[in-house]
Amino acid sequence: EPHVVCRRQRQMCIRDRNLPEKSIIPKNPIQAFFAFLLEDWADEWWWRTAMHYRWHYAEGAHFASRHLAEELLSSIPLPIWMKKIFLMRRQRNGYTTGDGITSKNLKTVEEDFLNLLNNLDKIFKNRKFLFGSRPSIADIGFSGPFFRHFALDPVPLEIIRQKAPNVLDWVSTLWKARLSELSDDFEEGIPNDLEPLFKEIGQVYLPYLSANVQAVKQNNKKFDFEFKDVSLRKARFLSLIHI
């Protein structure tokens, strides 16, 4: 079994062993390692950017807060506008400005998202999924921020439509995919067009995880992290990382 770094990935390994005909983990151990790495980066790094687009801009904040107010706070006897204000303040304080994204660094945060879209769009222009004609655990990792955030919320969705149509096609293809009906396998080796993603992981995400580990060891619930010209202050640690 490939080395995994969190409980979520352990569960996926167990699922893969029990359902070999629906495998999402490459049998090649090198492929599997890099697929797990992409899955972790996609799921644990990009949620902050997703929350920024959801709650920073008025269009996204009104869209999300109304949905949450109607779904989660329906039993509370308050006007819908009051529930929306509460939710917007709560989410911004907890997940955007309250988690290190400020007016000083949001330009770079958004540029990084555009860079991600550009890299993914080139990949999905050549093939259906990250490692070939079959979805892998890496695709599942990216489905988290894309299914529920980037391709759902109005602001990032419009950016994807304009800048990365192949990514939007991938979202639809992955959603409709039935593993038991796919006879194609993963490509051999590591596709060259994944290199920009791994470069970004090495330059930003791995140092971020290292700072995260130090915070866990020191029992600090928040930590500071700097990358490029961004200074994340009081970022929350990821408690499921295994040291």
Predicted regions and their residues:
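Single conserved hydrophobic/aromatic residue that forms the stacking wall/gate
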Residues: 2-14, 242
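Short, thiol/selenol-centered motifs that function as redox-active sites or metal-ligating centers
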Residues: 1, 13, 35, 134, ...
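Short, glycine/charge-rich beta-strand/loop segments that flank catalytic centers
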Residues: 25-39, 52-60
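N-terminal G-site helix/loop of the GST-like fold
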Residues: 1, 18-19
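Short, polar/flexible loop-turn hinges at active-site or ligand-entry regions and domain interfaces
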Residues: 20-28, 156-157
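GST-like fold's C-terminal all-alpha helical module
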Residues: 47-241
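Buried hydrophobic packing segments
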Residues: 15, 38, 145-149
